[in-house]
């Protein structure tokens, strides 16, 4: 995990116009919690039950509410460490864990027996969709599939009724969650070579590292671009993924074939 990248994003965010480029109250709370969780646990298994990194923008489920708390909440919740109370709380976690296991079992049954899901699996390529400890998944023909990726495939399939993704070379996404949509598109549409991915801090950090896991040096992060006055693609056909925080939208100097936003605009 590039802690220098995370720190640079956090520090530079303090210098920008807060009304334009910082999150509102809801996401500000979430972002502060995510930063704490990143520094405490890193990105390992951030899609799993034990991490609070990706709650609200990734596909993890909540097992322990303490992972969702900020500073004041963590102080108040410290009373749960009192031996007798901790025993009760541990029992509650065991019950919650049992409910989650049953939920995931039923979810798996629904997905792997759904004809639409089977058709999507035949139509699209799903590679390494359950990395970083994904629990929202099912197994079909000995292959694990993320339900989140299936849902994205369904959305792309619907969009494809009116738009042909095979006809674009460049793609710009705002609010890409943890980068999974871009991963899915690049897996299925080899014609897409140039990506701009913009999200808030620290979500953009998570998405950057997620995409770097798959695409390595093809990913350009904020450490590469923070001093660049005009951000644009290299003039070649090599894969290029430029990951930027909100304030760098002013530095973009690039024509884009397709702009995409799935959900974040409705939250603003």
Where are the predicted features?
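Conserved Class I S-adenosyl-L-methionine-dependent methyltransferase catalytic core
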Residues: 35-166
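Conserved SAM-binding motif I beta-strand of class I
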Residues: 194-200
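Conserved class I S-adenosyl-L-methionine
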Residues: 167-177
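Conserved acidic residues
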Residues: 169, 256-257
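Membrane-proximal basic amphipathic "stem/tether" segments
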Residues: 1-32, 75, 104
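A short SAM/SAH-binding and catalytic strip from SAM-dependent methyltransferases
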Residues: 258-268
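S-adenosyl-L-methionine
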Residues: 211-252
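Conserved SAM-binding loop of SAM-dependent methyltransferases across substrates and taxa
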Residues: 178-190
């Amino acid at each position: 995990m590039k802690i220098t990248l995370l720190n640079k994003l956090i520090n530079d965010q303090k210098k920008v116009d807060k009304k334009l480029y910082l999150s509102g109250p809801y996401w500000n709370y979430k972002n502060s919690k995510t930063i704490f969780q990143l520094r405490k646990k890193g990105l390992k298994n951030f899609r799993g039950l034990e991490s609070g990194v990706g709650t609200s923008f990734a596909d993890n489920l909540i097992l322990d509410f303490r992972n969702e708390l900020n500073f004041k909440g963590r102080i108040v919740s410290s009373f749960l460490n009192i031996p007798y109370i901790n025993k009760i709380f541990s029992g509650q976690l065991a019950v919650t864990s049992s409910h989650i296991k049953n939920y995931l079992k039923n979810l798996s049954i629904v997905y792997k027996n759904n004809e639409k899901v089977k058709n999507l699996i035949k139509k699209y390529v799903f590679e390494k969709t359950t990395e970083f400890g994904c629990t929202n998944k099912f197994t079909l023909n000995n292959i694990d599939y993320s339900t989140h990726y299936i849902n994205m495939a369904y959305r792309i399939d619907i969009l494809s009724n009116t738009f042909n993704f095979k006809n674009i070379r460049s793609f710009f996404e705002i609010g890409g969650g943890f980068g999974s949509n871009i991963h899915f598109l690049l897996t299925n549409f080899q014609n897409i070579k140039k990506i701009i991915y913009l999200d808030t801090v620290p979500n953009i950090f998570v998405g950057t590292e997620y995409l770097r896991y798959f695409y390595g040096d093809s990913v350009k992060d904020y450490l590469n671009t923070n001093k660049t006055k005009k951000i644009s693609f290299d003039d070649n056909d090599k894969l290029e993924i430029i990951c930027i925080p909100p304030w760098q939208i002013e530095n973009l100097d690039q024509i884009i074939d397709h702009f995409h936003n799935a959900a974040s605009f409705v939250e603003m």
